[in-house]
Every structure is written in structure tokens, then in C-alpha cells.
Curated annotation (Swiss-Prot):
Gene encoding the protein: tilS
Disulfide cysteine pairs (residue numbers): none
Keywords: ATP-binding, Cytoplasm, Ligase, Nucleotide-binding, tRNA processing
Binding site for ATP: 12-17
Domain notes: The N-terminal region contains the highly conserved SGGXDS motif, predicted to be a P-loop motif involved in ATP binding.
Organism the protein comes from: Mycoplasma genitalium (strain ATCC 33530 / DSM 19775 / NCTC 10195 / G37)
GO-annotated molecular function: ATP binding; tRNA(Ile)-lysidine synthase activity
UniProt protein name: tRNA(Ile)-lysidine synthase
One Pfam family here: ATP_bind_3
Catalytic activity: cytidine(34) in tRNA(Ile2) + L-lysine + ATP = lysidine(34) in tRNA(Ile2) + AMP + diphosphate + H(+)
């Protein structure tokens, strides 16, 4: 990491983000905490983050969600949007585009297992250590640690943290996967992690070969030419096209984009809040709306 105080950091009050806050305090310009007001212990978590930021002398922005907000069916997606909207606002305020998040290796294998369970081909399995999303450069410095290692470090260095009791409840698919993985031995987790990393490496190598063949298409992304490739290659080409334009999307969105470019679909497809994909003169094009 480069110069001082150039990152904002998402901190929930859990062991992961509290360890990250302590380890990278000299790099953090401001902490963002979102209180969703969905648990009886939400205020407890907020107060812990407030106290620790005060102790470390780090500015804090707390975004409190209206307790009367009607949550949609997919709570996690809605919560993520709220969270990233606040990250973007705070990053703009501090004139940066760099964000620290505290995902770790258990999060990585949870995500990978969810992707495999869904039986959908992905261009990357798990969670990237670095990526770009919603105009923010995201860094995940704890990806080298397992959850139990993080807890051990917190206890060793007397770093306070709270526990989200709902993580143990099978109310979301991610929680179900987490509870299943908790039954695995450390060796099983390590083996799964290594296997996923190998899978990602193979995908990247295949993508490199594909890109050499498809340089012309990336310069002029004709949807008719795209359909001459296999479905897997189509997904990888769309992914590469968007990455080239600094737009990060997941596998589900790429599937939706493939559906979108078929005839008789809507004229524009929302990629991010103000970025839309469209088909113009039989070619993919991006539309930016302010």
C-alpha cells in the first residue's frame, strides 16, 4: 500500500473489520459504519466502532438506516447497495477512491461454494483480493487469514469486537453454506481453497488464450460475432469487455447480459447506478447517465 491516509474502511464491529482497523489505522482516512437497525444489538456494534475510532483518533461516518425501512426479499443485496452508496459518498468527501474491506479466506471459500452449488459457470470463483466496483478500488488485506486466525489475533492484541448472532441462523443461503463449512476440518478447508485457486488459474489461462483470438471483437463488440463463440467463451468475452471499461460484474449479471442482447429485449441494461449497456448498430455500447 502506498501513501498515508488514502483509504476509507468499512467497519462493522466484527472481529474481521476491527482487526483490519487496528492493523491499517495509519492508512485509513475515515471509517464507515452502517447501522441497518435490523438487530437488537445493532446499536451495541455501532457504539463499539465509535469508541474504537475515538481511541485510534480516526474519523468515523455512521450511516443509520431508517428503522421503518421496508426491506426487499433479498436483504443482502439491498444492504450491499446501501453500504456502497455510503462508501462512495465518503470516498468522494475524502477525495479518494480506495476502500478497505475485511473479507478473509472463510469468506472466499463460502462464496466459491455458493457459486459451485448454483451450478453456474463463473469467470472467477471466490472473492478477489483486489477489484474495482462502483468506481471504487477495493482492497481486502485480510484474505491471507482464516477466521479462527483473526479471532486469535484479536484476543492476543486485546482488540474488542462483537459477534453478529444472526450469522449462526440459517436465514440466508450464505449462512447455510457458512454453517456447513464450519463442520469441515482445517485440512478440508485448505484443500478446497487450493482447488479453487487452481480453478481460477486455469480459467485465467483459458481467458488469455481466448483474448488473443478475440482482440478484434473487443475493439468492435459485434453481438452477431459474439454468438459464434461457445456460451462459456461468450461469458468470458463479456466479462473482459466490461473489465476493460473498469466495470466489475458477477456471474449472475453476465448471464442476464447474455439474455439482454437477444432480440426483443429492452433497449438498455443497468450495469451500475449510472452506467447502462445497450446494443447500438449491432455492437455493445456503454451509456453513462449522470
Amino acid at each position: 500500500m502506498a501513501s498515508e491516509k488514502q483509504y476509507i474502511a468499512g467497519v462493522s464491529g466484527g472481529s474481521d473489520s476491527m482487526l483490519m482497523l487496528k492493523l491499517y489505522q495509519k492508512k485509513i482516512a475515515c471509517v464507515v459504519h452502517v447501522n441497518y437497525n435490523t438487530r437488537s444489538t445493532s446499536l451495541r456494534d455501532q457504539k463499539l466502532v465509535e469508541q474504537y475510532c475515538q481511541k485510534l483518533n480516526i474519523p468515523l461516518v455512521v450511516h443509520t438506516v431508517d428503522p421503518d425501512l421496508v426491506w426487499k426479499k433479498n436483504f443482502q443485496n439491498q444492504a450491499r447497495k446501501i453500504r456502497f452508496d455510503q462508501f462512495k459518498k465518503t470516498a468522494k468527501l475524502y477525495q479518494t477512491n480506495k476502500l478497505l474491506l475485511a473479507h478473509h479466506r472463510d469468506d472466499f471459500i463460502e462464496q466459491a461454494k455458493m457459486q459451485l452449488d448454483a451450478k453456474k459457470r463463473a469467470v472467477y470463483y471466490g472473492i478477489k483480493t483486489r477489484c474495482e466496483l462502483y468506481g471504487l478500488k477495493i482492497y481486502r488485506p485480510l484474505m491471507k487469514y482464516w477466521k479462527d486466525e483473526i479471532i486469535a489475533l484479536c484476543r492476543q492484541d486485546h482488540i474488542p469486537y462483537e459477534i453478529d448472532e444472526t450469522n449462526k441462523l440459517p436465514i440466508y443461503k450464505r449462512n447455510e453454506v457458512r454453517l456447513e463449512i464450519e463442520k469441515w476440518s482445517k485440512i478440508e478447508k485448505e484443500q478446497f481453497y487450493i482447488a479453487i485457486c487452481a480453478m481460477n488459474k486455469t480459467i485465467a489461462q483459458k481467458l488469455f488464450v481466448l483474448m488473443k483470438k478475440a482482440k478484434k471483437w473487443l475493439l468492435q463488440p459485434d453481438v452477431r460475432e459474439l454468438k459464434r463463440f461457445s456460451i462459456i467463451d461468450q461469458k468470458q468475452l463479456i466479462y473482459s469487455y466490461l473489465i476493460y471499461h473498469k466495470i466489475n460484474v458477477n456471474g449472475e449479471k453476465i448471464d442476464a447480459i447474455l439474455d439482454f442482447i437477444q432480440p426483443s429485449q429492452q433497449k438498455q441494461y443497468r450495469l451500475q447506478n449510472d452506467i447502462f449497456l445497450m446494443v447500438k448498430n449491432q455492437c455493445l455500447a456503454l451509456l453513462y447517465k449522470s
